[in-house]
Design a protein with these regions (language model features):
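Acidic, mature catalytic/reactive cores of soluble proteins
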Residues: 1-176
């Protein structure tokens, strides 16, 4: 594409398109997980390879800027270009939710942490974040379980899904 803008020409890295690829591979991972398909491990591997090529996993020299800044392109001649909230940010948010095992289907939040890097779970303590204003805590466990808190009472979710209305907190134990 040598006729495109300077920062979109030959030799550039188009970060937004890589993020779109990451989202597409993630969708295939979840389809394979839903079907218990034998291709799941290979798709998980491909997902991690694409993820390793993006943003915070890159060096400043490779990215051309601070790796967590939202840029659209890194030109072949160096330096990130077109700063700002590009479409890449949207894909990165969606894929991160997926990496945390969160999917919304038919009005239910489904928990399926098939892409969660277990190294993110502290040996002592929890991986904590908020999603839709609800605090989540993930801990290492021997069996993957999910619990939600409503009206001060914890409820087990054996199907690993829940209706989000009225949920005050979520906890999960995640098996290796």
């Amino acid at each position: 594409s040598g006729t495109m803008f300077g920062y979109e020409g030959l030799g550039c890295i188009y970060w937004h398109m890589v993020a779109k690829l990451l989202l597409a591979v993630q969708e295939r991972v979840f389809e394979a997980a839903d079907l218990a398909a034998p291709e799941l491990p290979a798709l998980q591997h491909f997902y991690r390879r694409v993820r390793d090529g993006l943003g915070y996993r890159k060096s400043v020299a490779d990215y051309g800027a601070f790796p967590a800044d939202p840029y659209s392109h890194t030109a072949g001649e160096g330096g990130a270009q077109q700063p700002g909230m590009t479409g890449q940010v949207k894909e990165e948010i969606l894929t991160r939710w997926g990496e945390l095992g969160l999917r919304v289907r038919d009005g239910q939040v489904h928990f399926q942490p098939v892409l969660l890097d277990r190294a993110e779970l502290p040996a002592d303590g929890a991986l904590r974040f908020t999603w839709a204003g609800v605090p989540f805590a993930y801990r290492r466990g021997t069996v993957t379980t999910l619990r939600v808190q409503r009206d001060g009472v914890w409820h087990d979710c054996p199907q690993r899904c829940f209706a989000p209305q009225g949920v005050a907190a979520v906890e999960a134990d995640i098996a290796p």
